[in-house]
Amino acid sequence: MADPKYADLPGIARNEPDVYETSDLPEDDQAEFDAELEELTSTSVEHIIVNPNAAYDKFKDKRVGTKGLDFSDRIGKTKRTGYESGEYEMLGEGLGVKETPQQKYQRLLHEVQELTTEVEKIKMTVKESATEEKLTPVVLAKQLAALKQQLVASHLEKLLGPDAAINLTDPDGALAKRLLLQLEATKNTKGAGSGGKTTSGSPPDSSLVTYELHSRPEQDKFSQAAKVAELEKRLTELEATVRCDQDAQNPLSAGLQGACLMETVELLQAKVSALDLAVLDQVEARLQSVLGKVNEIAKHKASVEDADTQSKVHQLYETIQRWSPIASTLPELVQRLVTIKQLHEQAMQFGQLLTHLDTTQQMIACSLKDNATLLTQVQTTMRENLSTVEGNFANIDERMKKLGK
């Protein structure tokens, strides 16, 4: 049984089950939650923020090369290697092969170019600070310029040939230019060789270059479709620029909302041809006749409007004339209506009282009738009881007399 001192405390729900609520986790989950919270708030854990969009853009249209890969556990003399990747993959299909001097030179140029770009970005974003650093962006830019000058001054292009001067930003264009230059050189060599007369067959020149051209029709179709889409886009922009919006107030712009540029040009040409001198005279004559009709319609409309206005004014005047005698008696009529209103209210109250009195009178009459009926019954009962009592007394007297004898 509960303690009686807690019986009348406020806020206690009666005739309801007891509910114990808490915001804490169960005991089994509290230790795990504390460990996760400590790991999230600890300064020893490095939290890396990953941008999904940047990661997608970086690895978009990239494929993993599986040539020469072996993940098996077979025993052999050669080492089984899986995927190999580095910061700079400029060897193409020759991953795992030692770099040639040309490839190393291209990689160094690429690294210097990337470092220069990053330093320029740092110089644009980082503000000058009072604290001294070991390598400030300005000093680093100077060192990069000196390194690039030293790399260019090594004259590796002369040693490695024109292949080392490939433009890394546009390798396909650079290869095409190199192909054209070597073809021109081959033509010049053939022209010089045909000018001299030789009696014996000369062996084939080993300096000639043989090229293999591989056609890619899918890429050609894709590039052609891209060019067509670009052309359609430019035509759409041109049509949107030339086309004007439909203006209901301007008759000259009616019908210029064509489906394409050719329809708009045809409509404009038809409108311009309508401005011929011979056509303008006919248009002017028709406009003069139309203007005369418009003036007549305006005059007729003005006369009709004047007649309508006069009729309305006459009706209003007659109404005012009829209202004048009524307006003089209106205050007395209002006063009388107010008085009659009070009288009507008193009469209504008197009628309600009469109705209540009549109802009360009927109730009293009914009560009197009931009381009279009850009185008659009581009198009858009293007579019967009185006669019975008298008979009983007579019997008692007779018995008393008999007992006295």
Curated annotation (Swiss-Prot):
Pfam families from the UniProt entry: Dynamitin
InterPro entries: Dynamitin
Residues recorded as bearing N-acetylalanine in the entry: 2
Protein name: Dynactin subunit 2
Region Disordered, annotated ranges: 1-25, 187-207
Gene Ontology annotations for the cellular component aspect, listed alphabetically: centrosome; cytoplasm; dynactin complex; dynein complex; membrane; microtubule
Assigned protein family: Belongs to the dynactin subunit 2 family.
Coiled-coil regions listed in the entry: 105-132
Keyword Cytoplasm applies: yes
Source species, domain of life: Eukaryota
Main location: cytoplasm
Membrane topology recorded in Swiss-Prot or TrEMBL: Peripheral membrane protein
